[in-house]
Amino acid sequence: MSKLKIDTKRRFSLLIALVLIISLSSCATTQTNVTAITTKTVFNQETTYHNLLKLKKWQANGFIGIIYDNQAESANYTYLQDGDNFSIKLYGPLGIGSIEIKGDTNSVSLANSKGQKLTAKDAKTLMLEQLGWYVPVEGLKYWIKAIAIPNIRQTSELNTNNLLSKLSQNGWSISYSNYQLVDSKYPLPTKIRMSRDNLTLKIVIKSWQI
């Protein structure tokens, strides 16, 4: 009887170890290589812009702070973009449970942790109705990469690395800091501040997956 117990324990331990190895291997394959950008690195602005413009699919994870109408909220987020399709999951200290905003060029939906789902033609209308604030998703797929929306008027400033430090477009004032090189090719920011009217978004990007 004791031998059977020992064998069972050994098998269970081996199974747990195998699961951990598989999990760690899976995580390793999804993590994108990230390196620091030194102050001496100077990027070619045109090449960088076109490389980032071609980047159509990614996942960004981090933290967002929202200040609006003298109120402040915060949440963790997972933001996925695949061409024109996007998904933004907000969870944590938001105060309303977790929510997910999904959409494309035709429609947008918002689902909460209670199983309720609402749809609208655009994310701004839906988020203002349900949250009182909004994320400019139409521009975000460009701005989160620190590039301007193509063919729309904008003003910008560059830092010593020849990367965007400030951008004004579509009524938004955006500032960038703490860049890192992702996948050995893409200089991407880790801190973004976006302001328009009485709304300010502070976005911290903890990890990129490309």
UniProtKB/Swiss-Prot annotation:
InterPro entries: LolA/LolB/LppX (IPR029046), OM_lipoprot_LolB (IPR004565). It is a lipid-anchor. Gene3D superfamilies: Lipoprotein localisation LolA/LolB/LppX (2.50.20.10). GO terms for cellular component: cell outer membrane. SUPFAM superfamilies: Prokaryotic lipoproteins and lipoprotein localization factors (SSF89392). Its main location: membrane. A lipid is attached at residue 27 (N-palmitoyl cysteine). Disulfide bonds: none annotated. The keyword Chaperone applies. It is found in: Cell outer membrane. One of its GO terms (biological process) is lipoprotein localization to outer membrane. Belongs to the LolB family. This is Outer-membrane lipoprotein LolB.
